[in-house]
C-alpha cells in the first residue's frame, strides 16, 4: 500500500497526527475532498481505528495508518521514511482541561515532547509546512481585560490550566523555531473555541471515552439513555438567560478552516517563512440554554436537566473575533448551532455507542500488524458469529453455537497462497468461467489471462480475492443485528477488465436468527461498460468438529435443472436435469466420501430470460438446503440471483483435501458475457447499478 500510494498519486501527502480523533477525522475528509492524500498517525489513546476504517469508505480512499506515539521517535520516523510528506497538520495530544490539573506531568511530557520530536523529524526530512491545532484556552480568562470580548488574536495570553499551558508552550516553540530560520518554516497556529456537531453522513463524530467533558456529547448521551440528566453549571450569569456564553463552531467548518490555513501556507511567498495565529470561531456567542433548546428541537426530546453551582474558573463570555481568518484565509463559518445539533443527533441515533460496539472484536491477520489487514468478528460471544477480512472482503469464519461451519485460515498468509482455491472470498469482477478468456464489449475485443484449462475463471489475475477492500464500517442498527460494509475501487489499470468499478458489500449479521445477508452493489465511475458477476466462495462443512469431510451431508436443491456444459465447462445452450434431490423429493442426496460429484450451474427458473443487471428487488428465493445429522446443523441458502453453482470441492487445495467443503455460489450464468440470451444480465453500463443478494441461514 505504501508503494502504491507513492507511485500512483501525484497529490501532496499530508501527515495528520491524531487523525483518528474527532477533529482530525473530519479534517481528513476535507483534505481528501480537496485533492490531498493523507497519512494518519495516532496512538489511539483516546480514539479508535474504526474511525479511519469509516473514513476510507466515506472518502473512497485508502488511508495509510500508523499506530504510534509521537514521543516514539523511531516509530514516528517510519512515516517519514516511507512517505514523502509535504506538510503536517498536528492534532495529537491529551486535551481534557480537568484531567490536566490531576496529571500535569503526563500532559507536559506527551503534548510538548511529542511536538518537539515531530518538529525534529520534519526538520530532518525537509518538511516545513505545519498547521497546529491550538486552543482558545491559551487566552485564559479574557474577561480580565477591557474590550477583549470578542477575543482577538492580540489578546494577552494567560492559560489557567496545564492543558492550556502545553498549547501556549508549543506556540512559543513554533515562534522560536521560526525566528531561528525565517526563510524556511511556515507555521499556522489555529486557536479554536468550542467544536460541536458531526459529519452530515452520520459515519463519523465525537466518541468520548468515559464521561464526556463537553456540553453536546453529554446531552447526546442523555438523549439515548446513557446518562440520567444534564447538569448546567450556573444560571445566574449576566446573560440573556443566566447561563454562560460560548462560541460554538460546527466541526466541518472547523475542518475546512484547517484546509484554508494549509492552502494559505502553500500560497505564501516561497522564499519567506511565516508563523501566524488565527482564531477559528463563528464570532457569535450562544448560551448553554440556547444550545440545550436547539438540541432538544433536533432530537425531539425534552432532556432532563439540573442547574447546579458555577464551576471554578468559568466566566461569562468567551467568543472569538474571527476577522483575521475571514480576511486572510478567506474562511468563515457557514453552519449554525442548529445544523450542529441536527448532525450530532444523526450521528448519535445511528451510533448510540459511538465506535464502541459490544460483540465486535478485531485482530491483526498479518505479522506486520497492519490495520488494513485485520480479521473482524461480529457477534463475538453469541450463538452466531461471523469473521471477515479486508483481503477479498472474505468470510474467514462462521460459527453456529460455537461450531465453525466454513473453511478458512488462521492468518492472511493462507489467503495469499497462490493456490488458495478462493476460500471464503468475494469473487469478482466476474465469477465463474469466461470461454477462452475472451469477450467483446462496446465494439472492442478483450482477452483475459487463461487460468483454468482453456478458460479464464473467477476473473483470472484480476480476481477480487487478492484485493484489499476498504473499511469496514461496522454498525449495530438494532438489537442482535450488526452490519459491516466493505468497499473496493477496482480501476481499469489494475485489471484486465474495462472501466473503473466501485464495489460495495454489506454484510448483515443477525445473531438471533443465525443468518448472514450479503448485498453486493457495483457502479462504473469511468468507462462505458464492464462484465460483472459477484458472489461469495465460502466452503461449508457442517460437521467440522467430527470430520474433515463433507461425507454424510444431506443436500436438497430447488430444481434439477442445470446449464449443460461441454468438455471445457462452457455452456452448450441447453438446460438438462441432474441427479440430485429437490425440495419435493422424499429423500435428500447424501454426499459420500467420493461421490456424487458436482460442479454444476443450476438454474432457478429454466424458462427465465434474464436481463436484469440489478436483482435486489427480486424475491429472495430458497435455493439450497444442507443438513448434517451428526452436528444437527441445517444451512439454507437464499438468493435473488438466476443461478447457483454447486461444487463439492473435489479439487480443493492450499492446505485442504478434496471434499473437505462444498460451495454454493449464487450468481449469473456461466460465460454469460458470451451468450446473447444472458449477456444483458452481466453487462453493467455507466449510470446503472449492479445489485444482488445472498443469505446464509442456519438452524
Curated annotation (Swiss-Prot):
Concerning what turns on (or off) its expression, the entry says: By galactose.
Q: Which residues form the active site?
A: 537 (for mutarotase activity)
Sites where the protein binds NAD(+):
13-44
Q: Which residues carry this modification: Phosphoserine?
A: 562
What pathway does the annotation place this protein in? Answer: Carbohydrate metabolism; galactose metabolism; Carbohydrate metabolism; hexose metabolism
Give one Pfam family. Answer: GDP_Man_Dehyd
Q: What does the record give as cofactor?
A: NAD(+)
Mind telling me which Gene3D superfamilies this protein's record contains?
2.70.98.10, NAD(P)-binding Rossmann-like Domain (3.40.50.720), UDP-galactose 4-epimerase, domain 1 (3.90.25.10)
NCBIfam families according to UniProt: galE, PRK10675.1
This chain belongs to the protein called Bifunctional protein GAL10
User: Lineage from the top down?
Assistant: Eukaryota, Fungi, Dikarya, Ascomycota, Saccharomycotina
